[in-house]
């Protein structure tokens, strides 16, 4: 089903233990969402046997998240890009800035009124792009864009995989209302499915 909206753009800071496993901080509003474009790059290998493709393996390599937002405040700019805020409240960007990865959440409204929810487990953002334009005869909004690289997380799930994204659609059979209602209170942790009954 088609999506017709985008909102509730959040981020959660990441801290890593000695092994590099992530612990997520409390989610906070990143900005008002205008657009979100997610593209994924895959590693692919094809095994040829008997004059044809016998096996194909495709695995997540990395991705790119491009966010169009209404504004980026000083605290958010600092958290995402590594810029510093000086004693006068001025955001100072340096040549060696490189923010730490964060988790990112948002939701997309579907045409049936339900929402599809997302968590991207590890995104490292660059410096926000700024577009400026003088005021002419008509008003034209100029808004920032921020682009980040999506990576798999270091911490493994119950299958010893390294997840990079969690996604759920509201109203889908088997989806608990508790999962939806708590989506923005903490970064979603994959839950081990019950073994199939025989």
Where are these regions (language model features)?
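Short amphipathic beta-strand/extended segments with alternating polar/hydrophobic composition
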Residues: 25-31, 117-123, 160-169
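Solvent-exposed edge beta-strands and adjacent loop segments
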Residues: 1-77, 125-143
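Structured, beta-strand-rich domain cores
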Residues: 55-121
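Intrinsically disordered, low-complexity segments enriched in small/polar residues
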Residues: 3, 8-9, 18, 22-23, 46, 50, 115-119, ...
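Intrinsic disorder/low-complexity segments
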Residues: 34, 104-106, 167
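Mixed-charge, glycine-accented linear interaction segment located at domain edges/termini
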Residues: 128-198
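Generic structural motif
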Residues: 14, 70-74, 109-111, 123-128, ...
């Amino acid at each position: 089903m088609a999506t017709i909206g985008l909102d509730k753009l959040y981020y959660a800071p990441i801290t890593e233990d000695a092994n590099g496993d992530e612990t997520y901080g409390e989610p906070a509003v990143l900005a008002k969402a205008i657009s979100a474009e997610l593209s994924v790059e895959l590693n692919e290998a094809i095994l040829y046997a008997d004059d044809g493709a016998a096996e194909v393996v495709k695995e997540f390599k990395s991705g790119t998240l491009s966010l169009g937002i209404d504004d980026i405040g000083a605290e958010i700019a600092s958290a995402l890009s590594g810029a510093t805020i000086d004693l006068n409240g001025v955001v100072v960007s340096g040549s060696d800035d490189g923010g730490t990865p964060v988790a990112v959440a948002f939701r997309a409204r579907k045409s049936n009124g339900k929402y599809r929810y997302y968590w991207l487990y590890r995104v490292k953002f660059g410096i926000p792009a700024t577009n400026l334009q003088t005021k002419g005869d008509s008003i034209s909004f100029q808004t920032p864009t921020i682009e980040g690289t999506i990576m798999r997380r270091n911490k493994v799930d119950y299958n010893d995989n390294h997840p990079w994204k969690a996604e759920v659609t509201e109203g889908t059979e088997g989806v608990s209302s508790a999962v939806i209602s708590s989506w923005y209170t903490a970064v979603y942790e994959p839950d081990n499915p019950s073994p199939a009954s025989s």
